[in-house]
């Protein structure tokens, strides 16, 4: 493993710098972007100076579709519906790992981890309209 680490570090000119291994929590200031329980949404970021590569990871977590399923989900999987207990930092594992032995291809990338807390399968909240039909070309 020491050989893998040495090889990976030699590929990056800034690898001799002290690397930050923790992803830091950033809470969004836009009050319309919230988790199921109304707590603010956010993301974790680990910047790697000198790297132009970015890895953005959207956490999975299924969904709820009624008051009953959402209440049940809140009792059993609260972390997927609220940011209230998110820690201020996280350490990535697997593809998010900052360790070259564990993640030889992406260890030095800028990393963004977006926790899933809205139970909407990342679909957002676009308002419904009464408009039907094909819009066609705009030119």
Swiss-Prot record:
GO terms for biological process: negative regulation of Wnt signaling pathway; protein depalmitoleylation. GO terms for molecular function: palmitoleyl hydrolase activity. InterPro entries: PAE/NOTUM. Belongs to the pectinacetylesterase family. Notum subfamily. Probable inactive palmitoleoyl-protein carboxylesterase. This is Inactive palmitoleoyl-protein carboxylesterase notum1b. It comes from Danio rerio (Zebrafish).
